[in-house]
Amino acid sequence: LKTCLIATDYTCSPSVKDSALDRYFIPAASLSGDFLGGGITPERLRACGIPVRRMFRSGVRKEDAKRAFGIPVDHRHLVMMCGSMGCGPIMSIARRIARALPADQDLTIVCGTNKQLFGRLSRRFCGVNNVHIRSYVKDMALLMDSADLYLTKPGGISVTEAASMRLPMVFIDAVSGCEEYNKDFFLRTGGAVTGQTPREIARTSLKLLSNE
């Protein structure tokens, strides 16, 4: 029986060094040193990227995706997502972005299963026509197809999905551990940018959305 590991973060997780599998499929050749340092022999490594579902490579036209979510096709669209539980300083960043968001740009915030956050944001932005608050989104791929910029925490799968769609990213509030390594990998390779504070993150997002 052959066994393998498919790494879904851009680092060698601590438990990998305790394993003895036939193959280790890793996100990038540049990460080989991390796995070799963990005791994995070179012949067992295969650099092949992180697999994502086909829907994240479907290539739906951005205009059609925007129509599906009620976003005007001539508007720039920022999608803000912080995991299925809606973690991170979303409220602080959202307030700063919404305050300076031009009328021809839209912000969609996905709260996931965080009902308290959904309620707070819905009340805060009630009546703001270009700020849209959503709870759990089933067709996340279609929403990402509608986006011109993606504001997210650096989870291994979610950032790979965005990268496969060639979607520009701004990172929010990485959780200590694997997400820090994911963040560092994408910042180093030019796949994303970030800021040190909610103010910096909001300012960077607005500049990118306006192509400044």
Feature-to-residue mapping (PLM):
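A nucleotide-sugar donor-handling region in carbohydrate enzymes
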Residues: D22-S84, T113-Q116
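A donor-sugar binding/catalytic signature common to diverse glycosyltransferases
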Residues: M140-Y181
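C-terminal "capping" alpha-helix adjacent to the active site of nucleotide-linked donor transferases
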Residues: L187-G190, Q196-N211
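Helix N-cap/beta->alpha junction signal
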Residues: D9, P27-S30, T113, G155, ...
